[in-house]
């Protein structure tokens, strides 16, 4: 069975709360770092989440 091209990534909150989301990303079509505006339930606001590696 072939390996998938998509890799797991972690989106970490820029608010410094430690909250994160996990998702997958196609490294071949999107080599740049991902930045999304998502809801942070700790501060109860929409903040920017930046891509980080899953350890």
UniProtKB/Swiss-Prot annotation:
Pfam families: Ribosomal_L33. PROSITE patterns: RIBOSOMAL_L33. InterPro entries: Ribosomal_bL33, Ribosomal_bL33_CS, Ribosomal_bL33_sf, Ribosomal_zn-bd. GO terms for biological process: translation. GO terms for molecular function: structural constituent of ribosome. Belongs to the bacterial ribosomal protein bL33 family. Keywords: Ribonucleoprotein, Ribosomal protein. This is Large ribosomal subunit protein bL33. The lineage of its organism: Bacteria, Pseudomonadati, Pseudomonadota, Gammaproteobacteria, Enterobacterales. HAMAP family: Ribosomal_bL33. It comes from Edwardsiella ictaluri (strain 93-146). It comes from the Bacteria. GO terms for cellular component: cytosolic large ribosomal subunit.
């Amino acid at each position: 069975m072939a390996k998938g091209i998509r890799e797991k990534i972690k989106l970490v909150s820029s608010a410094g709360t430690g909250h994160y989301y996990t998702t997958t990303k196609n490294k071949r079509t999107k080599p740049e770092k991902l930045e999304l505006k998502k809801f942070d339930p700790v501060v109860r606001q929409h903040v920017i989440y930046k891509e980080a590696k899953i350890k």
